[in-house]
Structures are given as structure tokens and as C-alpha cells.
Regions:
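C-terminal catalytic "cap/lid" subdomain
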Residues: 6-7, 11-257
Length: 257
């Protein structure tokens, strides 16, 4: 299922994860889709300001937060250019990783400018990020190695840091049974099990650089094997991110074991 660039009409009343209250002292990881930083998106500066405020507020409540940022349009464009002369997936992945680290730097510097206690460097590995998250309240990173999308990196960071959940903030309203661009009758889901999500996105196999799906299948496989809950939502509405972090109802899909 590919990323969807428009809000879908089949939105229902916000849903709340049962038995999870993230009022204070929580560790949460957020996977921010690179599309949220696209330069052509209107009011992107307002979105960034809202996101920074949300993170600052959660840190003030005692949370520790890892943020993993995708490459978005810069990654896809760079990969498209290079693919004319490069056919090795690992080499193309490295181009995408560079774009994710650029986007991560934008988020990190914005947080630092607002006085949020964020780690001073962009980690190059999940293990490094875990160490940083033990020292600072917020860590921002991009991709790490070829074959691992930022969804996968975020879920791995959530697992290794003992996070309560991983929030997948993308440009998709919910998880659908099929891509609604291809099938207008595709069914939106308020909730799924991890196994059901794996069945929708496909087997946990890397599908090449620059791919765009609601959640990367490899990352879902990691979530399945570690029973890591996922909140999947349209991050273009920053309020949905806030609601998820606060453990409140939000418009999106709750995925649990």
C-alpha cells in the first residue's frame, strides 16, 4: 500500500488505546514521514512550530521521546537521479539515508532553538540513539544502514529503549485494506492486530530504496516479533500526534498484539 497524499473522507470518531495512559514518565518513539517536511506543503513552518511545542510539552511532563525522520521528497528525487546510473540497492539506500539525516537535522535544530533538551548530534545507529536517550530527554535521528527504512529504525529504537509504543506519523489518515486510490471501496481500520497489519502490508522484505507505504513491512515484522504497539496517523495534523502521545483518542489506526 503506497503513501497517500490526501486526507481520506472515511474518518470516524477518535479511538483510544485500551489500558494505556501516557500522562507522565513515558518513553515513546515517533516515526515522522519525510513528506511532512515537503517544501511545497503550505504552512509547513506552522506545522514545525506546533510539533516542537508538542514535544516540549511532553518533555515537561516527564516523557522521553525518540524522533526518527524520513527522507521524503529529497530522498526520492535523489534516488531517481542516481538510479539512471546506479542499480545497486545499497548505494541507492545510502542516498536516501543522507536525506533522512538532513531532515532530522532540521527537526533537531528547531527543537534546540526552542530550548528543548535534545541530544546534540544525529545518531548513526539505534544503539547510539539508545545511549543518547538515556542522557537526554529527546533524540532525533534519521536512517542508519541500507535495508532499514526509518519506520524500521523507529520500531527498533522503540524496542531497544523500552518504549510504550511507536507512533507512525505519515500522510495517511488510517490503514486501509487496499490503496484507496486504486479501490474507492477500500476499508479503513480503526484498530488492527500486528499480524493483521503484516498481512496488509506484505511479508517483511526490503523492497528497495525510496519506497512509500503506510508502514514498511520490515518494520512491521520487527513490531510483530517484539509485540510493539503502533499508532498510525496522519501527522500533517499535529494535534493527532499530541493526542497519541497523551494517550487520548485520535483519528487513525491503533495496532496491538
Amino acid at each position: 500500500m503506497g503513501g497517500i497524499s490526501t486526507l481520506q473522507p472515511q474518518l470516524s470518531v477518535g479511538i483510544e488505546r485500551q489500558g494505556v495512559h501516557l500522562g507522565s514518565m513515558a518513553t515513546v518513539v515517533i516515526a515522522l514521514g519525510g513528506s511532512l517536511l515537503r517544501p511545497e506543503v503550505e504552512q509547513r513552518q506552522d506545522w514545525l512550530s506546533d510539533f516542537v511545542t508538542i514535544i516540549r510539552d511532553r518533555v515537561s511532563s516527564g516523557d522521553r521521546i525518540g524522533v526518527v525522520v524520513g527522507g521524503g521528497a529529497p530522498a526520492r528525487e535523489g534516488i531517481e537521479i542516481a538510479s539512471q546510473s546506479i542499480d545497486d540497492i545499497d548505494h541507492l539506500d545510502r542516498i536516501g539515508i543522507a536525506a533522512t539525516r538532513l531532515n532530522a537535522t532540521i527537526i533537531r535544530e528547531a527543537l534546540a532553538a526552542y530550548g528543548v533538551p535534545v541530544a546534540g548530534t544525529i545518531p548513526s545507529s539505534v544503539d547510539e540513539a539508545v545511549v543518547d536517550l538515556n542522557r537526554k530527554e529527546v533524540v532525533v535521528m534519521g536512517g542508519t544502514v541500507p535495508g532499514h527504512t526509518t519506520d524500521t529504525v523507529a520500531i527498533m529504537l522503540a524496542v531497544k529503549s523500552g518504549a510504550e509504543k511507536c507512533v507512525i506519523a505519515t500522510n495517511v489518515a488510517k490503514v486501509y485494506s487496499e490503496d484507496p486510490r486504486d479501490n474507492p471501496d477500500a476499508e479503513p481500520f480503526d484498530s488492527l492486530t500486528l499480524i493483521e497489519l503484516q498481512e496488509i502490508v506484505g511479508p517483511p522484505e526490503h523492497r528497495g530504496a525510496g519506497g512509500s507505504q503506510v508502514v514498511d513491512p520490515v518494520g512491521v515484522g520487527r513490531a510483530v516479533s517484539n509485540s510493539m504497539p503502533l499508532d498510525i496517523l496522519d501527522g500533517r495534523d499535529a494535534e493527532r500526534i499530541r493526542q497519541s502521545l497523551e494517550g487520548k483518542g485520535f483519528e487513525g489506526t491503533v495496532v496491538e498484539g
